[in-house]
């Protein structure tokens, strides 16, 4: 009963189905299904600010500025959308699901010099609420013939503007139009976003909360042919999860923001249910060879707990600060051999002791899975060729077996 959570004892570790791998007791599904994923323990970088950490993790490039949230290099999803822009399945190749009210660059999901045509198609809000709606995926009172007529008229009207355009703006607009019309004339997107088509038992398995239903929608989108789906699990305190006074909106678990152990009593079971339901479902439905799942944040948290006065509670409470020197993440699916632990840290969890890896290695692995040459380059705004990854190699254990 999340409404009754108070200051609790420290959580303990429990064994998993992988010998030698323990996880927090608040994540029983991670323990039960550990044989279906790999844990990478030794990823590290040097950007401790949220903005710099997001950009470093999501682009595979060293950000020009260590703070703020505007990408100076394209995120991986935008690269995938660029490479696969010729593939039209009536649904975008890059989709992001997030709480809403934020711009894409808050989560370092911007396209930078690739242009606005490679922004993700945003799905905002809480899919569990009755008012949840994905706009612009089906015509409203407009037949396919009328949509076609209007596009022909628009083509004539913008011819002069196109001749005057020297910055490629019209090209980006064209791609938006093509994507929008393709979605309007196909019911693929409408069906993929419609969670009511799922059995109630499946929706229950993912959890009747925003994280669970976003994870379920991600699986449906991949089945519909979307190449890259990003699910932002930021605020669990939405529908069916009452706000906890000593909790925090996101994972920023400084002591001034939250009582970390109380917050995790709510947060981790929701995360555990949503992520493991997705991974297990992907295997049960035979999608594990073509679908690669990556679970990560922008950096780790300090190995040592700090204590400060909480701004919401007014009392001293425990928390953890930013720590990019070492972090763990999960890979699943992708046809890889699972049940592995890759890399290690020193005994205090401070820095890698074995197999130090970077975000570049993380994304080189993803690009390899997608069949994308991770050494390719695209021109920046000055026309200079910019490699999508200036360095890095795929993690062998996380490639197709």
For the regions a protein language model found, what residue spans apply to each?
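Ligand-binding pockets and gating/stacking loops
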Residues: 5-401
């Amino acid at each position: 009963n999340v409404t009754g959570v108070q200051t609790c004892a420290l959580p303990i570790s429990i064994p998993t189905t992988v010998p030698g791998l323990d996880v927090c007791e608040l994540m029983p599904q991670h323990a039960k299904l550990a044989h279906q994923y790999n844990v990478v323990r030794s990823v590290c970088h040097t950007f401790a600010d949220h903005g710099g950490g997001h950009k470093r993790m999501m682009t595979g490039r060293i950000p020009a500025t260590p703070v703020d949230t505007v990408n100076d290099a394209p995120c991986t999803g935008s690269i995938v959308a660029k490479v696969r822009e010729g593939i039209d399945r009536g649904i975008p190749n890059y989709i992001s699901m997030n709480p809403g009210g934020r711009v894409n660059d808050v989560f370092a999901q911007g396209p930078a010099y690739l242009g606005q045509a490679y922004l993700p198609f945003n799905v905002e809000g809480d899919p569990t609420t009755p008012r949840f709606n994905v706009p612009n995926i089906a015509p409203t009172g407009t037949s396919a013939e009328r949509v076609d007529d209007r596009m022909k008229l628009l083509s004539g009207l913008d011819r002069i503007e196109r001749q005057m355009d020297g910055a490629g703006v019209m090209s980006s607009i064209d791609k938006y139009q093509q994507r929008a019309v393709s979605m309007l004339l196909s019911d693929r997107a409408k069906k993929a976003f419609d969670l009511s088509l799922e059995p109630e038992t499946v929706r229950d398995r993912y959890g009747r909360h925003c994280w669970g239903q976003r994870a379920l929608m991600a699986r449906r989108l991949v089945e519909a042919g979307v190449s890259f789906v990003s699910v932002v699990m930021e605020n669990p305190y939405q529908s069916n999860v009452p706000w906890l006074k000593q909790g925090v909106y996101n994972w920023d678990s400084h002591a001034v923001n939250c009582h970390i152990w109380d917050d995790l009593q709510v947060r981790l079971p929701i995360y555990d249910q949503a992520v493991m339901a997705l991974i297990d479902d992907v295997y049960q439905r035979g999608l594990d060879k073509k679908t690669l799942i990556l679970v990560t944040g922008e950096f780790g948290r300090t190995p040592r707990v700090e204590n400060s006065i909480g701004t919401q509670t007014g009392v001293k409470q425990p928390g953890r600060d930013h720590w990019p020197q070492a972090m763990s993440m999960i890979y699943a699916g992708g046809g890889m051999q699972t049940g592995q632990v890759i890399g290690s840290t020193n005994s205090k969890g401070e820095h890698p002791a074995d197999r130090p890896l970077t975000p570049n290695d993380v994304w080189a692995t993803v690009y390899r899975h997608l069949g994308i040459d991770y050494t390719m380059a695209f021109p920046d705004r000055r026309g200079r060729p910019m490699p999508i990854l200036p360095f890095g190699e795929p993690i062998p254990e996380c490639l197709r077996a």
